[in-house]
Amino acid sequence: MQSGKMKALMKKDGAFGAVLTEVPIPEIDKHEVLIKVKAASICGTDVHIYNWDQWARQRIKTPYVFGHEFSGIVEGVGENVSSVKVGEYVSAETHIVCGECVPCLTGKSHVCTNTAIIGVDTAGCFAEYVKVPADNIWRNPADMDPSIASIQEPLGNAVHTVLESQPAGGTTAVIGCGPIGLMAVAVAKAAGASQVIAIDKNEYRLRLAKQMGATCTVSIEKEDPLKIVSALTSGEGADLVCEMSGHPSAIAQGLAMAANGGRFHILSLPEHPVTIDLTNKVVFKGLTIQGITGRKMFSTWRQVSQLISSNMIDLAPVITHQFPLEEFEKGFELMRSGQCGKVILIP
């Protein structure tokens, strides 16, 4: 088992940015595994932490190592771990659940009452090594590219968002084409949606959405999404709306563009409470609204694995940049600019 020091990206104090430094390699307990990180992906949550915005100030306790999307090789296992072996190539579910609350005991551990998140509430993966509970391990095929393997967790968000509905044969609208929105476009197309409408203001990401399978892209700075969706659906609206932006105006538009009897799935995290027209946009339309959090453990991971292994989705276009961990600032500046898809850091 490894001991000594490792390089790691730390949030040292309550301020903008992060610091690359040396810290002790994590010591694992009897139920944990130690993983040597091969690739780590920057998530929108990591950008919130890097920016040190209101959410980060309220949630994050510094100093700590952040990052939660990764792939790597198991280098050590705790004394009570029999399900994971040294040398296995893995990724990890990032929600650490208690296994004792009512949701956990009734097959809904993705909404565990006592959830902790790797890289948010515990030390994360922007480092040479990370430790995780053995129960969170997901084994990867030996031939899977480490960068692809590192983005299975956010792909799981997209899969969960889209496949809680039955998009086949209908129209899916994806509002917000950040990396998870881009992956949701690919999932909807793979699931048989006849139309996948990608909506954003970022022309770079709308071009990526086309590569990911969008049948139509809508720039909100040039076009009216409601008119476009109405025209493409003979006035009926989208059967499924996936809200990924978190903007109040986008949420209102999403509810308005959903078809009567349709579904509105929201993964985004609005910064402030949002007022919606429940009477006209939800009740009278018979709309189903579903909040999406995390991934179902582990049925969503199985869907992710099968979508990748069957080549039903191509994730290559969404990974636009890779940097060594030492050049993390370039990666975070790209993420902050929006002129990228997924950015990968290599320790």
UniProtKB/Swiss-Prot annotation:
Its EC number is 1.1.1.103. This is L-threonine 3-dehydrogenase. GO terms for biological process: L-threonine catabolic process to glycine. Homotetramer. Its cofactor is Zn(2+). Catalyzes the NAD(+)-dependent oxidation of L-threonine to 2-amino-3-ketobutyrate. Gene3D superfamilies: Medium-chain alcohol dehydrogenases, catalytic domain, NAD(P)-binding Rossmann-like Domain.
